[in-house]
Amino acid sequence: MMLMAIYHLHCKVFSRSKGQTAIAAAAYRSGTKLEDHELDTVSDYTKKKGIAFSEIALPSNAPKEYADREVLWNAVQEVEKSKNAQLCREFEIALPKELSLVEQIELVRTFAKSLVSEGMIADYSIHDKNDGNPHVHILTTMRGIDDKGKWMSKQKKIYSLDEGGNRIPIIDKKTGQQKISNGRRQWKRETLLDTSWNSKEQLLAWRKRWSDICNEAIDKKNALIEEENLAVNLYAQQEAISHIDHRSYAEQGVNKTPTIHEGWQARKMERLGMTSERLEQNRRINQMNSVWSQLDTLSKKYRKYNEDHYQDYQKEVKSVKQKSIKTYKKRQT
């Protein structure tokens, strides 16, 4: 038996077109009070509970004052001026509750540093209300920082190519020849938005990276658990933690239905004695997954036998289904 670590990584982008601000987003996630210099407003979330840890990671070439959250996100809003500008990206990630806060911080720092190595700034806050749902919010800038500590452009220029994949020369209308400037031949170029950080491929790479980094932390924790278990009796031993997997069940070849994200509001409803449809849906999904798991086990068990055992197989399958129906009906009463 192993403790099941949960994989959840969700990305979204905050933008002006949605009426959002980077200052408000950062203040809420860090549980701080920040002044918005552009709107002349204050976002105060100092009474927000459950902020376990908060920190900003900067590239080595970034201005040191960006370690101040208010300075950083006001600078972002100053450079992202267009009415539909993307202000920041948020990673919302579930943390293994089996890890201590110190271990969770080390895990998040490792992932944040990997993002910073790509040029962005990362502002992250760990939330934990002791409700079994520790998670981290990581806000990252949409632009990188250049060698001079300035914001990089979101655009890039590339050479225009003809159908054969060759660069297209700029022709001087007077001479009919290719233009030359400062001894260099001139070629047609076009400006493109640099959307590499917004690509589906990049998101998949980040999802896998988190899975890999998290599993390394889990392996480290399991090694400690194994060492501690050697020093205690059987009844005091701890369970190891399972790996997480960024792939869907279908991609893993697993016959399971994925659960939906519950969120703190759903769990709060149940603590107050109300019914949460999201939690009920996950219970139904988990029940069906349990049935499929049992049926898969039976299938593997009887696969090596001949047809004489088919009736035994059918009886066990029927038993599993009947137990499942009884459990479901019991929950409805």
Question: How should these model regions be labeled?
Answer:
Residues 1-333:
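N-terminal nicking endonuclease/strand-transfer module with a His-rich metal-binding environment
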